[in-house]
Structures are given as structure tokens and as C-alpha cells.
Amino acid sequence: ELEQDVSDMVWAIFGTAIHAVLEHGKNDNHIVEERLHAVVDGWSISGAIDLQVVEDDGIIVSDYKTTSAWAVMNEKIDWEQQLNIYAWLVETVKQKPVKGLNIVAIIRDWSRKDMRENYPVAPLQEINIKLWSYRERTDFIRDRISAHAAALFAVETNDDLPECTPEQTWEKPMMWAVKKVGGVRAKNVCYTEEEANEKLELAGKNHFIEVRPGERTRCANYCQVKDFCGQWNKYNAGETA
């Protein structure tokens, strides 16, 4: 039986409220909150598209995201995949070309004092997303259908489920930071302990190594079925998974 703490739903509710506000600002050439459907290899594919801007030479597909500064600073392939599926749906169902994709990111933890290289310049940011070819989109959708079919078969036959990739789990590797005693920022951040020890020797006295454990952010904070997942349980127990 699945359980979810209601406090975990705060940002989802906030995101829904933001969508409602933005919907009221639509123009005549805007299509807001439209769900499109198509069938591929016997599977039903659908997507609720936040905004379509219809222009003479094509459609711009946009999606609103209430997200973190970290997510904006680090490319999320999930966003690219999602919007390209939307583009495929638009071109398949409407037979009109898609000319562009973008994310409108509402950054909930934006702070002026955190400004640094690559940090979002404002709490609202538009991010252009790469538009794949129609063939690339079709191949990706068929690949995902195949993965879902394999997982469904594994469940029905009581077999092990396919494991998620590091990208799918939003995995952050373990890091070793070389810091000065009493300092706040790291002088060096290393991917191996060996490299960190070398940097520590060069740094001289009054420096130390801070171990920063790795994390699978999506599993830890967003997956509602992690308690039933063998891969997560192995990882959480310190085993390789």
C-alpha cells in the first residue's frame, strides 16, 4: 500500500496554482492546457501541453516548471525528452510543424545572494530546448514503449524489473572537497579520494578533506514506490546497484 506525506505535496499544489495564474494571461494565438492523444504500436500516448503559441510558420511548445535553481543549472534530459514527445504529438495529431520548444522555469528557491557563474539571473527563466527530428522522436517513443512493455511483463511473471540508469535516478556521485579550516567554500572539489589527497598536499596546512556522500535525488525525494524497489534498497544499504 502506498503512503504519501501531505507535506510532500506542497510544491505540486504551488505548481498547479502557478499554472492557473499563467493560463489567464493567454493571447489569441495561444492554446492553453490541451491534451493530445495518439496510438503507437498499440499503446495509447497522450500529453497535456501547457502552452502552444501558434505562428504562421509553426508552433512553439512551452511547458511550465516550478523547480529548483539546481535543476536549471544542470541540464535535465527529462525535460528535453518530455517536450520532444509533445512536439511529436502536435505534429502527428495536428499535421502542423513545431518550430521551437522551451521551458518556463519558476525557480522556487532563487536567491540573489547565491548569484554565481551559471546561476539563474532571475526567479523566472525561459530555457530553450533542443528540437529533435521527427524520426528521432518516433524512435525514442518506441524505445520507451518497449521498456514499459518489458517492465509490465516482468511484473506479470514475477521477474526482476529493469534497473533505472544513473540519469533516471538523478544520481550525484560521491565527492571529496578540499577546504580551509574555518572556511565556507571548497578550494577544490574532486571525484576521487586520491585526487583530493593530492590537492590537500598542495594546499598546505590548515586544510582538510570533507567527504560529500552521493545521492540518488529522484529516488530519495520523488519516487513513491522506492520502498518496494530492490535497486533502491540495495543502494540505501550501501551495496552496489
Please identify what each model-predicted range represents.
Residues 64-65:
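Activation of the activation-loop gatekeeper triad in protein kinase-fold domains
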Residues 10, 42, 69, 85-87, ...:
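Residues in intrinsically disordered, low-complexity segments of regulatory proteins
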Residues 89-241:
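Metal-dependent nuclease catalytic regions and adjoining charged, substrate-binding loops involved
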Residues 1-59, 68-70, 74-81, 114-118, ...:
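Metal-dependent nuclease catalytic cores that hydrolyze phosphodiester bonds in DNA/RNA
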Residues 17-21, 85, 139-144:
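Long, highly charged amphipathic alpha-helices
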Residues 79-90:
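Membrane-associated lipid acylation/remodeling enzymes share a hydrophobic transmembrane-juxtamembrane segment
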